[in-house]
Amino acid sequence: MCIRDSHKVIKANNFKGNYIHYGVREHAMCAVMNGIALHSNLKPYGGTFLIFSDYCKPAIRLAALMKIGVIFVLSHDSIGLGEDGPTHQPVEQLSGLRSIPNLNVFRPADTTEVAECWQIALQNNQTPSVIALTRQRVSPIRKQFTEQNYCESGAYEIMRTGNDIKCTILASGSEVGLAIEVGHKLATRNIYSKVISVPCLDIFEKNSEEIKSKILDETNIIFSIEAAKTDSWGKYVGKKGKSFGVDDFGKSAPYKEIFNDFNLKGDEISNSISGIIND
């Protein structure tokens, strides 16, 4: 899944290539990449579905422990996978990967964030990276490229709907677009918010308390939106806020229907936030 036209496949009788067909061998793939990184100055990367990171976990953990900058590209990162159903829809995997010390778990929102997260991963030689990507198409969140890498702080403000801010909405990946939709819906009720894209919680946590507090604006009620288990966000939303996510196994259906079944839709979330703020 990571192959390009410029790549040449390594074969039994020809080792001059730069691409390995591992087959359905996720653990072996990640372990081999660790070996390549330890043996040379090469920067290996390989890909599989996020759900299969469970097969890769020992090798990913060792990459973090050994401080080598391997890049693990993990696609189909949520219930957005759709009809393949709960066996292939990751729910708890992001939380598990985020719990590994010295591992950066990136979940970019669009192509611009993908490029920025990729740059960070390439430049980091002592911390391995997971780059979690969607299956479904997502609309561009940032329409213009800038020299500044906004993802390098782990989280940044991507929208605010007014001056009298009542809440902060955190989101990652494909749900950043949903958070923006929720922000606009709340604004029609005179509830103004700021939306924070959080491509990497691990990097965000390394900021000073002052910077984290400034980004979160902890004087507001904080909410989070992510199509995965919500336990990554509890420390931020606290008792006043709420996390919108997926705390059960998924379902087999078109992805939009599954998002609706888990109430991950603009109207439902904006109604819930409005009720909490006006309570």
Please place each PLM-identified region on the residue numbering.
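Thiamine diphosphate
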Residues: 4-279, ...
